[in-house]
């Protein structure tokens, strides 16, 4: 027989592959039909303890087993069966009860049963209030969904927007925060949510709160109405308005611990202690020093308090690693700090409520609430960072005496068992003097302390529950002294909006609106010449606290409205003194700024307005800001110096008492010293005595000068006498002596010329027209008169005549 052809064999192979694909597709469809049938037959009210008892797909079961999830918690056993059937769910359970898996497993299963692929677009959207919680949910999703073929993405702020845009259109499951999700819905053209099947809100009561109200409403407008919605939180909302906004259809309320005697885990030991506000830092430092081998979370009201306490205690070196986390940090820093605290065995982290919800830090021993939480729900979420998954944990709440009664009522209403403890005085450590020393040596730390003080006072003032938070019952002066400040900063409180609306408003939206309004109002500045002095004043220190320092001492802060409409997140409102007074239309107080010739005519129009702003404290008289010229005046340090009071010069007497340079007496003091004639006579006597003393001093000075001159003359004469002793003496010549000996000893003019000639430079060479006679005439002219002796002197008269000629 002839061998079979090669073409026929290839056709058989390709046909076998097609048959294998077809069989696999049929097998998958059969499995899906069985799975769907099992889900339909599932009894949602049945008690299920293990994941293996649920009708789950193979990839999900493998992912759960690989992640070591085998047993269901209470909330999972009740919520997962309902979610698999496609029901809308309102889930409420204690912190650390496994709510994350209760919605992630149904998300994977429902998309798997619908054969969801990359081409189908976005199938599930999971929204969390904070970035850290979104990252944690995404990591759990990656673990249990590792065997699925879905594409999942994490959309949070602080990351590259362009990279997210490029990948967003291919995602099947998204974990996000509200702000960044809304930004992509408005700006990313390739992002489509029309096929969305499931919407999950983790920590739903926080997301539906007024802080995210605008963002969530805008997101819901983009989403389709036909979808499955699940809400999970430890403190679930039941407001009809919130549920109507989400378009829930016959939602199932799952509250496994609603009938429990406590809203917190039973393994959590909860205590509170009454500590006056000025003593809180001392108590906290003593507590940290006593628990160096523990893992501690300390909650505070604001990020500025977190910064100040961290920077202060870091210098004191308590003996345990310190970390701090707040919402104003960069995303990379927040991730780094979160991972460090999670992996550490013993450390202390100072944080705001940004870590109060959902985050799962392993093995947290203590949760310390340095500041009173705004409500009982916030307290429950804060203490939920410890005692998770049945483990033991401890929590301590520091309460001011004015906060004790009201807060205990709120906790009792929420079924929170808490016991009072007393702190021994010897367990606290007084760090007041050390903080004062640090603030004195480091001005930037002092200004950061002022910002922390203002931020805390503002947070108390803006709280809605006045039964707990009353700014008048708090010792602000003592608190300022306890954090090292020389005195309490002056704060002018203004009426603000609702506390949560102000506190939880998105900062990005506030900043963008402020920038837009500034750009509309302020015209573009002209290009001006910048001198070296301008650059010198624009320099700033690049320190870790330089930003806080510059904000506290900035004198060119833009003025804000005084009707309470300014941004409540800014602290400058509380540090400035402003009021509104009527100003006459004919006010002409612009004398200082008449040299500004390049101002427009609309400045004068603005000056005729019915109202003006009055600023006190800069000069002796209040400054009325009723025109644009006056507003520009506030930005010029040179012009403000003209308005400030000039200093007065003082002189100090021998005892150190200050006096004015010119002090005038009144009439009574003058008469007390006597009549005018008596004072005149007394003045003349004093002046005469002063003149006599001055004469004596002058005479003594003259005598001293004469004596000094006489001593100098005597010294000079004595020096001359010494020279004369060395000179030659003239005596009568005897018969044996040569009469020419004296004259021969005297120097002759020729010798002097020879001596001088030795010191002079060499003569220049003669020219061709010069001869010796010319040289001799020049020498004779220079030497002057020369005595020529024709014959040698023989008698004494001849010698005397020769000597007289030489001497003359």
Curated annotation (Swiss-Prot):
<dbReference type="Pfam" id="PF13959">
    <property type="entry name" value="CTE_SPB4"/>
</dbReference>
<feature type="region of interest" description="Disordered">
    <location>
        <begin position="491"/>
        <end position="535"/>
    </location>
</feature>
<dbReference type="GO" id="GO:0032040">
    <property type="term" value="C:small-subunit processome"/>
</dbReference>
<dbReference type="GO" id="GO:0005730">
    <property type="term" value="C:nucleolus"/>
</dbReference>
<feature type="domain" description="Helicase ATP-binding">
    <location>
        <begin position="80"/>
        <end position="254"/>
    </location>
</feature>
<feature type="region of interest" description="Disordered">
    <location>
        <begin position="555"/>
        <end position="620"/>
    </location>
</feature>
<comment type="subunit">
    <text>Interacts with the U3 and U14 snoRNAs. Associates with pre-ribosomal complexes.</text>
</comment>
<feature type="region of interest" description="Disordered">
    <location>
        <begin position="654"/>
        <end position="795"/>
    </location>
</feature>
<feature type="compositionally biased region" description="Acidic residues">
    <location>
        <begin position="564"/>
        <end position="573"/>
    </location>
</feature>
<dbReference type="InterPro" id="IPR014001">
    <property type="entry name" value="Helicase_ATP-bd"/>
</dbReference>
<feature type="binding site">
    <location>
        <begin position="93"/>
        <end position="100"/>
    </location>
    <ligand>
        <name>ATP</name>
    </ligand>
</feature>
<protein>
    <recommendedName>
        <fullName>ATP-dependent RNA helicase dbp4</fullName>
        <ecNumber>3.6.4.13</ecNumber>
    </recommendedName>
</protein>
<feature type="compositionally biased region" description="Basic and acidic residues">
    <location>
        <begin position="767"/>
        <end position="778"/>
    </location>
</feature>
<feature type="compositionally biased region" description="Acidic residues">
    <location>
        <begin position="720"/>
        <end position="739"/>
    </location>
</feature>
<dbReference type="GO" id="GO:0006364">
    <property type="term" value="P:rRNA processing"/>
</dbReference>
<feature type="domain" description="Helicase C-terminal">
    <location>
        <begin position="280"/>
        <end position="439"/>
    </location>
</feature>
<feature type="compositionally biased region" description="Acidic residues">
    <location>
        <begin position="584"/>
        <end position="605"/>
    </location>
</feature>
<dbReference type="InterPro" id="IPR025313">
    <property type="entry name" value="SPB4-like_CTE"/>
</dbReference>
<dbReference type="Pfam" id="PF00270">
    <property type="entry name" value="DEAD"/>
</dbReference>
<dbReference type="GO" id="GO:0016887">
    <property type="term" value="F:ATP hydrolysis activity"/>
</dbReference>
<keyword id="KW-0698">rRNA processing</keyword>
<dbReference type="GO" id="GO:0005524">
    <property type="term" value="F:ATP binding"/>
</dbReference>
<dbReference type="InterPro" id="IPR001650">
    <property type="entry name" value="Helicase_C-like"/>
</dbReference>
<comment type="function">
    <text>ATP-dependent RNA helicase required for ribosome biogenesis. Involved in the release of U14 snoRNA in pre-ribosomal complexes. Required for pre-rRNA cleavage at site A2.</text>
</comment>
<dbReference type="GO" id="GO:0005634">
    <property type="term" value="C:nucleus"/>
</dbReference>
<feature type="short sequence motif" description="DEAD box">
    <location>
        <begin position="202"/>
        <end position="205"/>
    </location>
</feature>
<dbReference type="GO" id="GO:0003724">
    <property type="term" value="F:RNA helicase activity"/>
</dbReference>
<dbReference type="GO" id="GO:0042802">
    <property type="term" value="F:identical protein binding"/>
</dbReference>
<feature type="compositionally biased region" description="Basic and acidic residues">
    <location>
        <begin position="670"/>
        <end position="705"/>
    </location>
</feature>
<dbReference type="InterPro" id="IPR027417">
    <property type="entry name" value="P-loop_NTPase"/>
</dbReference>
<dbReference type="Pfam" id="PF00271">
    <property type="entry name" value="Helicase_C"/>
</dbReference>
<keyword id="KW-0690">Ribosome biogenesis</keyword>
<dbReference type="InterPro" id="IPR011545">
    <property type="entry name" value="DEAD/DEAH_box_helicase_dom"/>
</dbReference>
<keyword id="KW-0539">Nucleus</keyword>
<keyword id="KW-0694">RNA-binding</keyword>
<keyword id="KW-0347">Helicase</keyword>
<dbReference type="InterPro" id="IPR000629">
    <property type="entry name" value="RNA-helicase_DEAD-box_CS"/>
</dbReference>
<dbReference type="InterPro" id="IPR014014">
    <property type="entry name" value="RNA_helicase_DEAD_Q_motif"/>
</dbReference>
<keyword id="KW-0067">ATP-binding</keyword>
<keyword id="KW-0547">Nucleotide-binding</keyword>
<feature type="short sequence motif" description="Q motif">
    <location>
        <begin position="49"/>
        <end position="77"/>
    </location>
</feature>
<feature type="region of interest" description="Disordered">
    <location>
        <begin position="1"/>
        <end position="20"/>
    </location>
</feature>
């Amino acid at each position: 027989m002839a061998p079979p052809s090669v073409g026929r064999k290839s056709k058989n192979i390709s046909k076998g592959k097609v048959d294998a694909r077809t069989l696999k597709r049929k097998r998958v469809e059969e499995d899906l039909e069985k799975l769907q049938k099992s889900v339909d037959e599932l009894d949602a009210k049945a008690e299920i303890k293990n994941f293996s008892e649920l009708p789950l797909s193979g990839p999900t079961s493998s992912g759960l087993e690989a992640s070591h999830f085998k047993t269901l918690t209470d909330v999972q056993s009740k919520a997962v069966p309902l979610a698999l059937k496609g029901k809308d769910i309102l889930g409420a359970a204690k912190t650390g009860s496994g709510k994350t898996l209760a919605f992630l497993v149904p998300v994977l299963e429902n998309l798997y049963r619908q054969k969801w692929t990359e081409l189908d677009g976005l199938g599930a959207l999971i929204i969390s209030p904070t970035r850290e919680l979104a990252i944690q949910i995404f990591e759990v999703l990656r673990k249990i969904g590792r065997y699925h073929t879905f594409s999942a993405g994490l959309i949070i702020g602080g990351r590259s927007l362009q990279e997210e845009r490029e990948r967003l259109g291919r995602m099947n499951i998204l974990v996000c925060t509200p702000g960044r999700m809304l930004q992509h819905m408005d700006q990313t053209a390739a992002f489509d949510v029309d096929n969305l099947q499931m919407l999950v809100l983790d920590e739903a009561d926080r997301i539906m709160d007024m802080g995210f109200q605008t963002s969530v409403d805008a997101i819901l407008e983009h989403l389709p109405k036909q979808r499955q919605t699940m809400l999970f939180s430890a403190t679930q909302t039941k407001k009809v308005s919130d549920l109507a906004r989400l378009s829930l259809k016959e939602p199932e309320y799952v509250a496994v611990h609603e009938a429990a005697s406590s809203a917190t885990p039973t393994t959590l030991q909860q205590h509170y202690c009454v500590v006056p506000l000025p003593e809180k830092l001392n108590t906290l430092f003593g507590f940290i020093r006593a628990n160096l081998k523990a893992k501690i979370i300390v909650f505070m009201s604001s990020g500025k308090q977190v910064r100040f306490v961290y920077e202060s205690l870091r210098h004191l070196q308590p003996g345990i690693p310190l970390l701090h986390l707040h919402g104003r940090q960069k995303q990379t820093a927040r991730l780094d700090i979160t991972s460090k605290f999670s992996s550490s065995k013993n450390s202390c982290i100072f944080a705001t409520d940004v870590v109060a919800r959902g985050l799962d830090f392993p093995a947290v021993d203590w949760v310390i609430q340095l500041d009173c939480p705004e409500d009982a729900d916030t307290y429950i979420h804060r203490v939920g960072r410890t005692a998770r998954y049945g483990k033991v944990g401890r929590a301590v709440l520091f309460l001011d005496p004015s906060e004790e009664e009201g807060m205990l009522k709120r906790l009792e209403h929420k079924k929170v068992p808490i016991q009072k403890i007393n702190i021994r005085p010897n367990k606290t450590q007084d760090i007041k003097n050390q903080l004062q020393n640090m603030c004195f040596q480091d001005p930037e730390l002092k200004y950061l302390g002022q910002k922390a003080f203002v931020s805390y006072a503002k947070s108390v003032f803006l709280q809605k529950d006045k039964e707990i938070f009353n700014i008048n019952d708090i010792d602000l002066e003592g608190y300022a002294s306890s954090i090292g400040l020389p005195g309490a900063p002056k704060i002018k409180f203004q009426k603000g909006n609702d506390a949560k609306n102000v506190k939880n408003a998105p900062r990005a939206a506030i900043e963008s609106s402020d920038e837009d309004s500034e750009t509309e109002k302020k015209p573009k500045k002209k290009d001006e010449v910048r001198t070296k002095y301008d650059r010198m004043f624009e320099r700033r220190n690049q320190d870790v606290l330089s930003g806080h320092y510059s904000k506290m001492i900035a004198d060119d802060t833009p003025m804000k409205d005084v009707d309470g409409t300014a941004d409540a997140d800014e602290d400058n409102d509380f540090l400035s003194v402003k009021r509104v007074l009527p100003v006459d239309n004919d006010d002409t107080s612009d004398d200082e700024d008449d040299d500004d010739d390049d101002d427009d005519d609309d400045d004068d129009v603005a000056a005729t307005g019915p109202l003006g702003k009055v600023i006190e404290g800069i000069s002796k008289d209040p400054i009325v800001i009723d025109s644009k010229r006056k507003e520009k005046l506030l930005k010029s340090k040179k012009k403000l110096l003209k308005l400030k009071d000039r200093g007065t010069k003082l002189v100090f007497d021998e005892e150190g008492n200050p006096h004015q340079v010119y002090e005038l007496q009144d009439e009574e003091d003058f008469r007390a010293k006597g009549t005018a004639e008596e004072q005149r006579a007394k003045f003349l006597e004093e002046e005469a005595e002063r003149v006599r003393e001055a004469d004596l001093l002058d005479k003594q000075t003259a005598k001293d000068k004469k004596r000094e001159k006489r001593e100098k003359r005597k010294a000079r004469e004595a020096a001359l006498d010494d020279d004369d002793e060395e000179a030659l003496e003239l005596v009568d010549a005897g018969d044996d002596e040569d009469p020419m000996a004296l004259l021969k000893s005297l120097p002759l003019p020729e010798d002097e010329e020879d001596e001088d000639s030795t010191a002079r430079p060499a003569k220049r060479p003669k020219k061709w027209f010069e001869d010796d006679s010319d040289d001799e005439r020049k020498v004779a002219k220079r030497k002057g008169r020369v005595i020529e002796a024709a014959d040698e002197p023989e008698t004494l008269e001849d010698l005397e005549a020769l000597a007289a000629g030489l001497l003359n």
